[in-house]
UniProtKB/Swiss-Prot annotation:
One GO-annotated biological process of the protein: translation
Similarity-based family: Belongs to the universal ribosomal protein uS17 family.
Gene3D superfamilies: Nucleic acid-binding proteins (2.40.50.140)
CDD domains registered for this protein in UniProt: Ribosomal_uS17 (cd00364)
Described purpose of this protein according to its UniProt entry: One of the primary rRNA binding proteins, it binds specifically to the 5'-end of 16S ribosomal RNA.
Signal peptide span: none
Keyword Lyase: no
HAMAP family membership: Ribosomal_uS17_B
Name of one Pfam family that matches: Ribosomal_S17
Protein name, entry field: Small ribosomal subunit protein uS17
Record note on quaternary structure: Part of the 30S ribosomal subunit.
Superkingdom of origin: Bacteria
Species this protein is from: Mesorhizobium japonicum (strain LMG 29417 / CECT 9101 / MAFF 303099)
GO molecular function: rRNA binding; structural constituent of ribosome
Length: 79
């Protein structure tokens, strides 16, 4: 099974080798037929502490690194 890749924004880089990435998901509500935005925060491994708050990054699913980390930052989208 392929590993999932998500795009999001770094909202915290205070932890060592860890960033918190906010991923936004949009979908049409099945009853109201209105576009709904939902966000979720993921802790991702950032080996070199290269990413700062506000950066757009891609994260990839991986094996568990710690209690909360199951994602790795794979690349940065400099937009």
């Amino acid at each position: 099974m392929p590993k999932r890749i998500l795009q999001g924004t770094v909202v915290s880089d205070k932890n060592e080798k860890t960033v918190v990435v906010k991923v936004e998901r949009r979908f049409t509500h099945p009853v109201m037929k209105k576009t709904v935005r939902m966000t979720k925060k993921y802790k991702a491994h950032d080996e070199n502490n290269a990413h700062k708050v506000g950066d757009q990054v891609f994260i990839q699913e991986s094996k568990p690194i710690s209690k909360d980390k199951r994602w790795i930052v794979v690349s940065s989208d400099q937009a």
